[in-house]
Amino acid sequence: MKRSKVERQSMLKEKIELTPFVTDEQLAKEFHVSIQTIRLDRMELAIPELRERIKHVATNQWNETVKALPLEEVIGEVIDLELDERAISIMDITPDLVFSRNKIARGHHIFAQANSLAVAVINDELALTAKSNLKFTRQVNEGERVIAKAIVKGKDNRDRTIVEVSSYVENELVFTGEFFMFHSSNEKGEN
């Protein structure tokens, strides 16, 4: 059943308000129209593209800010953050992040997203990775979106904060990392 333009735009606006991280491609499939139609509808409704929506949500929904590094230095777009507890970031695998001959993402980009998220979740001015245990579980390809989720698990016997990061493409695990984080409050005997 084909919807009228007004009806489609109304439903589109509602959908984006409910799920601001939905892509134009996903919307096109859901509404059975072209990606270009979705983009034109968004322009008419003054709805920004995905990257701008992510930045808007990130800056407006946090009560806390990243302390250990500037937000623009976090690899990927941070979409959720609760210092010393959890954080989530997303990273779209673009052509500049892949090997040219096989379109597979370079592993250091997947690691960098996870590592910078582990740093960002620490509630301290200085946070450094002292040690990490990593496992890549499948290759990530150009065009895929990696969602990294960091959870602070506690402290080790050397008073380093342990951060576990799991990265997914859709619901499939592609990377896990356990990061042992040194931070300046370790020196002062705080936290």
Curated annotation (Swiss-Prot):
Transcriptional factor involved in regulation of membrane lipid biosynthesis by repressing genes involved in fatty acid and phospholipid metabolism. CDD domains: hot_dog. This is Transcription factor FapR. Signal peptide: none annotated. GO terms for molecular function: DNA binding; DNA-binding transcription factor activity. Keywords: DNA-binding, Fatty acid biosynthesis, Fatty acid metabolism, Lipid biosynthesis, Lipid metabolism, Repressor, Transcription, Transcription regulation. SUPFAM superfamilies: Thioesterase/thiol ester dehydrase-isomerase. Belongs to the FapR family. It comes from Oceanobacillus iheyensis (strain DSM 14371 / CIP 107618 / JCM 11309 / KCTC 3954 / HTE831). GO terms for biological process: fatty acid biosynthetic process; negative regulation of DNA-templated transcription; negative regulation of fatty acid biosynthetic process.
